[in-house]
């Protein structure tokens, strides 16, 4: 599996819009997408971390380089103070409870 972790800084008051925008990714049924998680930090509610999981590196980059993803990304940027800080990489361990 492959994915990214991104640090994002949301504009004030856009929490609900950010959650709705992330739901649009789920509704898009992106080929190879496994899961997405958004964390809102306790000590700074405007700071969010996004974790995205794909089946493999090829699926991740096929999505990242698609015009559809570019359009989704541009909509997401409207809710952020600036571009996310991306950290792409191979997922080397997974544990699921239950």
Enumerate the predicted regions with their spans.
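Glycine-rich beta-strand-turn "strand-cap" elements at beta-sheet edges
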Residues: 2, 35-46, 74-98
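Short, well-ordered beta-strand segments in beta-rich or mixed alpha/beta enzyme
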Residues: 2-8, 35-66
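Short, surface-exposed ligand-recognition loops at beta-strand->loop->(often short) alpha-helix junctions
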Residues: 7-18
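Non-catalytic surface loops within mature trypsin-like serine protease
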Residues: 10-12, 54-56, 90-93
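Intrinsically disordered, low-complexity acidic/polar segments
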Residues: 15-17, 47, 59-61, 95-98
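Short amphipathic alpha-helical segment that frequently serves as the phosphate-/nucleotide-binding helix
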Residues: 19-23
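An amphipathic, aromatic/His-enriched active-site/gating alpha helix that lines ligand/cofactor pockets
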Residues: 24-35, 53-87
